[in-house]
């Protein structure tokens, strides 16, 4: 293998390219991406609105700063129009509109995901915004700057983060959610009580059970959103915070895809075409709790799949990849994290039991920590955890993620060693107490 082409220079593509350059210095690596700012972190809009950065260009991955390795990469700024797998060539269009045929030997597809809705009519109107790419984020910041009334479609982690950032700017924010709870993919309904209270306290209007089907422009220039049940909402700008979807259209009729448009790969991330691999947001890794493919378009997944493939191509064997679906965020004065399955979703696969403990002061101002553990009833194996707190607990959710990965039970997790330092390790002790409580609860069933 003398040459490798990688489509997409964002997290998975860049991680793969740099690791390949390190492991196989003789390899010619061509990175192709139409975006000049492919290293942009989608959370840049929030960071700028919250005053963490001055310029959006500061929101880039800074982990890869080995100039010697970076200089080995051949970066091509061009749009891939077509993958012709039978001839093993790519059809490229350069910024000057020049078309070129580029032959490949081994192709790694790392085109990521898209945030645009395929189901909402009018989602392509000028005032309907997304924040996935650098250009989209630039446009969003510019178009909401002088506007006061913003509607966000989607109350997942993206929508809630945006709602918080906009509230800090004094904007009037309406959050529309299709389900009956916020962050339904990551948290059970009762765990969102403190977060929803904080949101409503600063004036965020949350409207649930509203599925937007159409967006149109009014005579005054505002945007009107119509739900599938006929409800109407009006605002000056609309931010789409819908779920990301794999950007796999170039691979249609080229390799096998699932119904959700994720690309089917084997344990080595190779597609149904022996010359084509897929990584990052294009694929669904097995969720360790259910051993079934689960789509999680997260930066950590992108980086690890890219690096994993590089090791495989360098001839270094590793155990097959799995995931635990771990996420974390901070908004409305609360740290929020989850890993694994929610109790509602997990109950579709297993007979589960859960235990939750809450630390909360009477005035709801100082101490607040809610921790919920979920396990299989038959053996206590941990399948999920959710934490809400005012203190930063994000390292703790990584510990639970590892516990899920190595299939610890509630009792095994309870009797793991942990640091006990008064005033510094209350969250670690809370995890111990909840794991112990879950174990005792199962004994009584």
Where are these regions (language model features)?
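A conserved short coil-to-beta-strand element within the FAD-binding core of flavoproteins
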Residues: 76-88, 208-221
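Rossmann-like dinucleotide-binding cores of NAD(P)H-dependent redox enzymes
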Residues: 159-214, 300-301, 318-342
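Cysteine/selenocysteine-centered motifs that mediate thiol-based redox chemistry or coordinate metal-sulfur cofactors
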Residues: 407-445
């Amino acid at each position: 293998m003398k040459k490798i082409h990688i489509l997409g220079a964002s997290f998975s593509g860049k991680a793969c390219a740099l690791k390949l350059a390190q492991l196989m210095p003789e390899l010619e690596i061509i990175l192709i991406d139409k975006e000049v700012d492919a290293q942009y972190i989608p959370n840049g809009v929030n960071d700028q609105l919250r005053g963490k950065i001055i310029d959006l260009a500061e929101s880039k991955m800074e982990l890869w700063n080995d100039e010697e390795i970076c200089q080995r990469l051949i970066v091509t700024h061009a749009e891939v129009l077509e993958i012709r797998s039978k001839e093993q060539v790519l059809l490229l269009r350069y910024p000057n509109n020049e078309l070129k045929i580029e032959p490949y030997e081994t192709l790694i597809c790392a085109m990521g995901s898209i945030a645009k809705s395929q189901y909402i009519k009018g989602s392509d109107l000028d005032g309907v915004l997304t924040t996935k790419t650098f250009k989209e984020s630039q446009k969003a910041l510019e178009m909401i700057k002088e506007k006061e009334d913003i509607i966000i479609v989607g109350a997942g982690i993206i929508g809630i983060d945006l709602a918080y950032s906009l509230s800090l700017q004094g904007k009037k924010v309406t959050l529309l959610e299709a389900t009956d709870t916020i962050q339904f993919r990551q948290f059970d309904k009762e765990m969102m009580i403190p977060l929803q209270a904080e949101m409503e306290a600063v004036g965020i209007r949350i409207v649930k059970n509203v599925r937007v089907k159409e967006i149109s422009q009014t005579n005054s220039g505002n945007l009107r959103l119509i739900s599938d049940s006929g409800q109407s909402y009006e605002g000056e700008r609309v931010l789409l915070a819908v779920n990301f979807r794999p950007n796999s259209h170039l691979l249609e009729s080229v390799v096998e895809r699932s119904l959700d448009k994720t690309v089917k790969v084997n344990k080595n991330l190779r597609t149904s075409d022996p010359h084509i691999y897929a990584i990052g947001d294009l694929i669904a890794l097995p969720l360790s709790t259910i051993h079934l493919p689960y789509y999680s378009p997260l930066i950590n997944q992108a980086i690890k799949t890219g690096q994993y493939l590089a090791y495989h191509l360098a001839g270094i064997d590793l155990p097959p990849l799995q995931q635990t679906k771990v996420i974390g965020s901070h908004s409305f004065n609360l740290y929020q994290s989850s890993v694994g399955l929610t109790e509602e979703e997990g109950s579709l696969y297993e007979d589960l039991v859960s235990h939750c403990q809450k630390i909360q002061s009477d005035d709801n101002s100082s101490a607040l920590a809610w921790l919920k553990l979920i396990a299989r009833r038959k053996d206590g194996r941990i399948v999920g955890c959710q934490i809400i707190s005012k203190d930063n607990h994000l390292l703790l959710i990584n510990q639970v993620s590892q516990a899920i990965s190595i299939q610890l039970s509630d009792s095994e997790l309870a009797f793991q060693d942990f640091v006990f330092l008064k005033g510094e390790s209350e969250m670690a002790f809370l995890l111990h107490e909840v794991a112990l409580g879950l174990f005792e609860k199962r004994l009584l069933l």
